[in-house]
Amino acid sequence: MISNDDFCTALADRGFDFVAGVPCSYFSGPIERLTRDGVYLPAANEGAALAAAAGAAVAGHRAAVIAQNSGLGNLVNPLASLTATYGIPVLVFMSLRGWPDPSQDEPQHEVMGLATHKLLDAMDVPHLTVPATATTADLADVLDHADAELAAGRTVFVLTQKGAIEKAAGAGSAGAVAAGAAAVAAEPGAGTAEPDAGAASRARAEGLGRVEVLRAIEHLLEGAAVVSTTGYTSRELFGVTGSKSHFYMQGSMGHAAAFGLGVALREPGTPVVVLDGDGAALMHLGTLSTVGAEAPDNFVHVVFDNGSYESTGGQVTTSHSTRFAVVAEGAGYASARVCDTADAVTEALAAALGGGGPHLIVVPVAKAGASAFSRATAAMTTTDIREGFAARLRGEEHSGGG
């Protein structure tokens, strides 16, 4: 058996300073230790954990994920369209519930236990195994092989059997309870939400456009690390700015905020602006809670709300019944505003970039129909996008792309 200390020391010795995850009892010991050391980010779901780790990785840090294989389905989206597509190396420790003998585990683990290896193989994801009989030397050997995959820009899974790693003293252990209490001790948002119920309908009726807003705030974005959600938002941001330093997401819908959070937590001196959409934000609304709990003061979250999935044909979302500003305030954001003019957005963003976050700015906009702009990948590769954003974080210029 590998002790908690040996497991965490092995990660630290190899430079891993960011671990996000969703708990499994197989990893209860390391999670308790990593939480105590201030290295662990408790994510709302496994996909968000991977997206946050990807953000930290692009920011130049070695990042890992801890999860149970029952959550592999949640990982598939960012695994297939973020880390694989952009060549982002993340180390994923995943427990092997329901394997090798499903009858020795709970019934809900049977299907995934038998399918885990096959699913990873189908996605061409490299994976290694830490058996129940593993020693610290065995772990070192596995990590040596994993490092080779990471060096090639690939996300790699380390599948971990029951009993391989020492468990925590108990679910209610003093360390875990103390860490949890500290995490919730901070006051929630400062009561600055401005949930103007009529703002959305007014802005949509008056035709406030996302492109209009992007043009108005373009000069402010030049001083920030910008992450834009998939769909028309990324197309229009690239079309308006032409910047090769923003991170344009194509895929991994709903995970822009988690990716930006990973960047913000590891680059506290850099303002991080996430340009999100209502449909994407709704898809992983739990990430707002993670942002509020971590409370990075350099994090600004802008949600363009047009009440639709515009790039897939304008199908309606449920944002009409969701008051994002109120949700964000309840989740612990320092401020949340609804802005229904380009001038108001500009003023709010300028203030938010001064720090004291996390801040949410909701921008009700009209549906624009088909976008007049091409995807960023019409001019750059996904590698160019990753490297351009990483160079921005290092304070350098990147000349990649056409």
Describe each region flagged by the PLM:
Residues 1-121, 125-152, 156-259, 265-266, ...:
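Thiamine diphosphate
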Residues 80, 284-305:
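A short alpha/beta connector and helix-capping loop motif
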Residues 147, 341-354:
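A short, acidic, amphipathic alpha-helical segment used as a generic capping/interface helix at domain edges
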Residues 155-159, 358-363:
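Active-site regions of oxyanion-processing enzymes, predominantly non-cytosolic
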Residues 160, 275-278, 304, 363:
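Active-site flanking residues adjacent to catalytic metal/cofactor-binding acidic residues
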Residues 226, 272-275, 302:
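Residue-level marker for buried hydrophobic side chains located in beta-strands
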Residues 270-281, 286-288:
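DG-centered beta-turn motif at the end of beta-strands
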Residues 307-314:
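Long, charge-dense
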